[in-house]
Amino acid sequence: MAATPEFGSLRSDDDHWDIVSSVGYTALLVAGWRALHAVGPQPLVRDEYAKYFITASRDPYLMNLLANPGTSLNETAFPRLYGVQTRFFDDFFSSAGDTGIRQAVIVAAGLDSRAYRLKWPNGATVFEIDLPKVLEFKARVLAEQGAIPNAGRSEVAADLRADWPRALKAAGFDPQRSSAWSVEGLLPYLTNDAQSALFTRIGELCAPGSRIAVGALGSRLDRKQLAALEATHPGVNISGDVDFSALTYEPKTDSAQWLAAHGWAVEPVRNTLELQTSYGMTPPDVDVQMDSFMHSQYITATR
């Protein structure tokens, strides 16, 4: 049996990717799970654009998943988990808009389509930060579908390890006005120092009244954990050949504690199971077991 790769073994300080390689492929995988959730029973959200990204990628594994969607509680676990996550961030931006915030920043936007899916208030602008190749792929696919955003949309092609605040401001972001920020699915792919730098830079760009939502994990499902979960819950592992441990870094400073110590008023932290309950769902055993590995945290805070 091959040895389990060390955390971050497929990463380097200056690595880059497109949508079908390295970290970029995880965005495609999550889009596939959102597409599956949209056609599943009682979806929390319907991302009607997600399926088009899979088709455009021509990835055989994901195309097969969409052509033959599983229906059991085990087979729909990952799509359900990401349905919960998507709903959380959707609600966050809707709530921020209700408070008068008109600048939304999606950090490491990947294949997020909220600028197109959500109803945004008049005058709202959605800033999407990600690597150029990821943004180019998304723009091409959405243009092919004739998609029109429901808010002003500004692409910020930048590496989060570089001077992305300069690029954000050049794209029209005004740090003197309040803003709402999402950090969704990103933190496992950052080192502890990079995570602290990200939060520091966000804080420096936030006027009073700004808000942030963070999805964090206390740990990640590595291949051994997925294999163990698959043994007790057949069909749950629909992540293909992705080895998350080799793409991500070890657990780091607690995000809620960091924010609270740096000027943010942090609301009570919830996990996936608590969110499911708040959405009127009863978490099945497979979801409970999955979260016992991942220790999910959903955080909201105000500046």
Swiss-Prot record:
Keywords: Methyltransferase, S-adenosyl-L-methionine, Transferase. GO terms for molecular function: methyltransferase activity. GO terms for biological process: methylation. S-adenosyl-L-methionine binds at D130, D159, L160. Its EC number is 2.1.1.-. Transmembrane segments: none annotated. Gene3D superfamilies: Vaccinia Virus protein VP39 (3.40.50.150). The keyword DNA repair does not apply. It comes from the Bacteria. NCBIfam families: mthyl_TIGR00027. Exhibits S-adenosyl-L-methionine-dependent methyltransferase activity. Belongs to the UPF0677 family. This is Putative S-adenosyl-L-methionine-dependent methyltransferase ML2020.
